[in-house]
């Protein structure tokens, strides 16, 4: 054991001396690994970023909220079975809330109705088109975490009275009010004046997934007064708005029970006979996730495979240079064997040499990748880049493995050299 | 040639070879490099192996140095059967029992004298402090105590061979196997190296010298001549001047 440690130490020393005396060659060879590690690391970072962006967008949906909708949150082949379903009315929320209140030990907390449409918003000379305009109640803050950068979300009184107030997203505020505070200013939405009472904190958009940054929210009563969804829905070619009801669950570990309870309530609300199939869908974040996860995983696997190829090319470079190194130092190998180096010792020596090269490449690669991530983060702040400690460890392990694998064949051939032949080699 | 007597009492048998042969396959042909060599070498001997090229001299040296195993025959090193050892066992024997001195020195070019001499000790698994101590001592013994941090390219040919001899000595081997140790040196430096070997012999080391030069072989106390893979002659030699030097 001790002897192994001394041999290991000796091998590192040789590897270091070898790299120093063949500086150009070592750096050029390591460059292959550098490029490979940069590619793999950036890919890993991008995948991590996708994950984070995805999770962030998912967090908007909330993992303890059920969504009652006309369409299920998944691809359906028999769309005709869903097309003719009755719309989800916002009034169901009141029904559900009544039943929740009457049910002891209900798994549900509160139902919140939402209606949405795409609308243009104006302030002075600035205009934003196609803003996701949401009408809801003050309970909305229970189902979604809304951070206000300025001002506040509307309260229950404003909600019930249908006050003409609005909470606007970060990006909307940015365009409409480039140089002043939007609070207490009045914006025009489809010709109606609304007072801005709050601005959401920046959330960041990702891959076009939903974000609070480009939306506005107002009391449902006001929404219904000015943008009657029922009329809208019947006009062809109009922006198709839609309504749904979201219900907060008490305990997210009991999501299934909550779902069953909500299904029962909805059947009652819709007056469905027991033999009838449900004509509504109850969705949760998980359903959405399970449709998107395979896509995300495919991107990750394909991406890592392709970038992995560049690392593989780097590994071939290392293998090549280790073969050269073995050839050049055949006589030295012979001498070492004559002095008592065993096969294992020689094997170890060359393995460590190739590993040291890969580690050097890996280290430089990581540094480059780190600065590139930093640069990308500065240039595209909306892209959620994720340079983690785990990634550093992972790429170092990958470097070592690359070194061991690419060095193995040359090191093995070195360890098998016949001492007599090796000594005679010129 | 008149006073044929051993210089001093010989020790136990270190190398015992009986009827060994070695065949090489060279393409279609089988080259029979050794055709039955028997030999006994005792501790404290100073032996020269001579012979023209092609006589099997190098092959015999490889056998004696445990770098290769014979095709047939018996080879015992300190009573252990070497002929049937595997690579790693042979490496262990070479490490502990044999000190090699090569014609081309075979030092590691980028390592200091100290590191070169330490090498066999590393392979023996010795701790760094002892290694350092013993390597320094060995270098001092060959007169290079002030050159331990020099690299081979900062040393003269003679000094390099001294480093190589220190490396051969450092693990306190049973035999020192010197293959044409003066072949790459001028005659004056060569004499210095031979004087160093003589000195080692006087300090109870066992030396096997492989050479084709008669005056180099003349330093030894016993000379074996090989021809066509067999021992042609095996005789004790005596060099009066050296005895005088040693006695004084």
What are these regions (language model features)?
Chain B
Residues 10-226, 231:
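ABC family nucleotide-binding domain
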Residues 1-23, 233-248:
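ABC-family P-loop ATPase nucleotide-binding domain
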